[in-house]
Amino acid sequence: MPHFSLRRAQCAATLVLSLTAAGLAGASPASAAGATTPSMKVLTYNVFLMSKNLYPNWGQDHRAAEIPKTSFFRGNDVVVLEEAFDNSASDALKSAAAAAYPYQTPVVGRSRSGWDATGGSYSATTPEDGGVTVLSKWPVLRKEQYVYKDACGSDWWSNKGFAYVVLNVNGTKVHVIGTHAQSTDSGCAAGEAASMRSRQFKAIDAFLDAKNIPADEQVLVAGDMNVDSRSPEYASMLADADLVGADARTGHPYSFDTLQNSIALDRYPDDPREDLDHVLHRTGHARPARWTNEVVKEQCAPWTVSSWGTDSTYTNLSDHYPLRASAG
């Protein structure tokens, strides 16, 4: 979508600093994971592929080609991407990933085509899509898109929402939602962005409630939640979406690092470092005895872009770090 205000991103980690999430897991009891509960590896990554019409100098095509080659991108069961806004760059990334992840959803909000159902407040006249897509190693039995009704600031101009997929993992159903929640930007009034996020998380909860998913099936919610794991809003997010916090959070301490990530530093030099990306289980459903979210401190070979006669060089593929989640 056209981003008339800058939005925050999130990232996820390499093995660098270990951060045990003493308040992350919350008080929710661990569900007993049955012997047939698949062990899932999930990657969420805000790829910062903004529209080249609005942001022509951020190396979208180069980064879209390089991301599928990275080690963190390989070996997952499911990949959830956010900010896959630019049509040609996101299509190229998905095409390059198709050998490893042959089962893919369209990008949320880009059109109604390719979905089994469209819910929420989808509009064909909204200037930008929602930027979320799900890539899977496993066959997709059903895929639905849902566009949030509530938004503020620049998010008002996009069809942001979530993708819902049902996967067939060796004969067992696994349910995954991929989302990008309301960004905090200058176009929102004080406290408004958090209020919009709360409504969006409640919309996810209501959507899943209506599915009446059996308790012995895993339900995962992944994405750029725009909620810092260390903030009071984190507990509210868990309650609103009916999620269980990760048992551990390892790797780099921030998925959105405005000091060490070269793109985030350039774009948001005055913003705080935050830990915004998450892959979490829904309460009351099968899940592993222990679930870990790991932020990967990604770095890449330097790449350079030119704007108004000035060269800028970066050593990251997005302004967020990727986050991997798995049992253990």
Go through the PLM ranges and name each one.
Residues 41-47, 67-93, 135, 165, ...:
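Active-site beta-strand/loop signature of hydrolases that rely on acidic residues for catalysis
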Residues 181-205, 226-238:
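Active-site-proximal segments of metal-dependent phosphoesterases and phosphodiesterases across multiple
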Residues 84-182:
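Structured beta-strand-rich core segments of catalytic domains in phosphoester-bond hydrolases
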Residues 52-54, 145-155, 181-197:
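Surface-exposed cleft-lining segments at the edges of enzyme active sites
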Residues 2-16, 23-99, 109-117, 124-129, ...:
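N-terminal, active-site-proximal structural segment of metallo-dependent hydrolase catalytic domains
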Residues 63-67, 89-93, 131, 144, ...:
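Stable alpha-helical elements in mature extracytoplasmic
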Residues 35-38, 72-74, 96-99, 124-128, ...:
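Extracellular/periplasmic catalytic domains that process cell-envelope and extracellular macromolecules
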Residues 210-220, 227-328:
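Metal-dependent phosphoester-hydrolase catalytic domains
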